[in-house]
Amino acid sequence: MEAPVSVPRHATLVERLRGVHLEMVDAVLGGDGLGRVAELAADAAGSDVAIVVPRLGAAVTNPGAEADLSVLRRYAGERGKERPPGVAAEVPISSGDEVIGHVLALGEPEALTEDALEFLHLAAVASLTEVAVEEAKEEVEQNLRGSFLEELRAKPDELDPHEVVRRAARLGCDLARGAVVL
């Protein structure tokens, strides 16, 4: 993983946006997750940030932020509900026409910098990337499970029992003590 891109505060807005965007993408693809994205967004926007993605079961804030994540989860899950107190601004995380989560600036609206929303939008794009990565991992895992089960069904006598136990364990299933299939 590369060293983080450090963007000075005196850089132009475009330079700051580009640098923060690269850091967010690096965080997602490097496996640092939405917590790191929230931290980067908070630092760039100058306010605490929460990211809530119900589809992933994720609700995170930057370190040190004070927020009731259960309230933010409910808010993100119940679209159209009144914005909870302590949420200064929000940007939806959208996939096509579907809103799958929110990036929330925490605090008072008056305290937000004029370019804070730009950084929240970057966090929304990075969050969407995280959703795509997680869903791709899940799909690959499902395909591996399906092909393993098909192989067990099609040629049960040709497979080495130790290999079956090993492969099942890699897919999260402990067959070391045996199993019964109905």
Can you annotate each of these PLM segments?
Residues M1-L182:
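Hydrophobic, helix-rich cores of sensory/ligand-binding and other regulatory modules
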